From Swiss-Prot:
Pfam families: Ribosomal_L35p
Record keywords, A-Z: Ribonucleoprotein, Ribosomal protein
GO molecular function, one term: structural constituent of ribosome
Top-level taxon of the source organism: Bacteria
Family classification: Belongs to the bacterial ribosomal protein bL35 family.
Organism field: Hyphomonas neptunium (strain ATCC 15444)
Protein name from the UniProt record: Large ribosomal subunit protein bL35
GO CC entries: cytosolic large ribosomal subunit
Gene name in the database record: rpmI
UniProt GO BP: translation
Length: 66
């Protein structure tokens, strides 16, 4: 049986932690940040843990847990 292919779009956006959770970047940080206050920008810095409902679908796109 051939190797399964990784969906590269998902591999660029998600990482799987050692415990199996999904990490992803927070949206809304590219441009037009003057309309947001400093608290919003500070809290959305870094990464976030993904929703449990989306885990199965995204893990299917990442068969080797990139």
């Amino acid at each position: 049986m051939p190797k399964m292919k990784t969906k590269k779009a998902a591999a660029k956006r998600f990482k799987i932690t050692a415990t199996g959770k999904l990490k992803h970047g927070v949206a809304g940080k590219r441009h037009r940040l003057m309309s947001h206050n400093a608290k919003y920008i500070r809290q959305n810095r870094g990464t976030s843990v993904g929703a449990k409902a989306d885990e199965a679908r995204v893990k299917k796109y990442l068969p080797y847990g990139l």
